[in-house]
Amino acid sequence: MSWQIISKALMVGLGVVGIVCWGPEIWAKPSPSQILHLQIPILGTSVNTQHLPMGLVSQIVIDLYERRDQDGLQIQFHTEPGKFSLFARQSIHQAITRALPAANLPVASWTVQLKFPYAGLTMYGESLSAMVALSVVAMAKGEPLLEGRTLTGTITDQGHIGAVGGLQLKILAAYHQHFQRVFVPSVYDETDGDWRTPFLMHVSPVRTLEEAYRGLTGQQLSARP
């Protein structure tokens, strides 16, 4: 079942520098030609109309642009059409602020804006955070994400891809959406049990940011001096 037709009351769960949360009418942006724009796939879990657990693939919209000041990285979250829970915002913020220094990127004048483009739904959880953060890095470096690939996991303070739950459901959701490769944490959630790889699909455990970024882009994480 497509997740778009689930009841709007359903809360979607996925698994400063400051966090700013505003309605879209409040922000003043540069001209569209100065804004980098990317829509990325993320894996999550929810329940269907029979209240059974299910995996799903949804989208996050990222805008990135450079300001004229040097007042520090700003990470902002749209409140429309969908929203991010406080935990999701904190997880994304933490992942971005860990990934950008690992890539040796100057960020003092950047603004990152994120949108969950599903009216009436709220994004919960942390498992989208590594995918969002490494996508921001790729945008900043001008390196496209490879088609048919996605990542689920967090970013730890040691620079590793952290464990998340619901892997089997997420892998199956990606398979049904015709993804060729899914990157998962090499350290598993012990309560999650084993997962199986669908036919003709690659599931690749990754430990470090470097491994995950190379898998998503085919490029090295760290920007050259």
Task: Kindly give the residue locations of the regions a language model identified.
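N-terminal Sec-pathway targeting helices
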Residues: 1-11
